[in-house]
Amino acid sequence: FFPIILGLVPKLVCLITKKC
C-alpha cells in the first residue's frame, strides 16, 4: 500500500497547491 500512497500524495498536493 505504501508505494501507492507515496504515488498519490504528491499528486494530491500538486492539485491542491497547484505547484508541481
Swiss-Prot record:
Cellular localisation: Secreted
Q: Per its UniProt entry, which superkingdom is the organism in?
A: Eukaryota
State a single Pfam family of this protein. Antimicrobial_1
Q: Name one GO cellular component term.
A: extracellular region
List the keywords (alphabetical): Amphibian defense peptide, Antibiotic, Antimicrobial, Disulfide bond, Immunity, Innate immunity, Secreted
UniProt key word Disulfide bond: yes
Q: What is its main location?
A: secreted
One of the GO BP terms on file: innate immune response
According to its UniProt record, in which tissues is this protein expressed?
Answer: Expressed by the skin glands.
Is Protein transport a UniProt keyword of this protein?
no
Could you tell me which cysteines form disulfide bridges? Answer: 14-20
What is the purpose of this protein? Antimicrobial peptide.
Family statement: Belongs to the frog skin active peptide (FSAP) family. Brevinin subfamily.
Could you identify this protein by its name? Brevinin-1LT
Task: Give the species.
Answer: Rana latastei
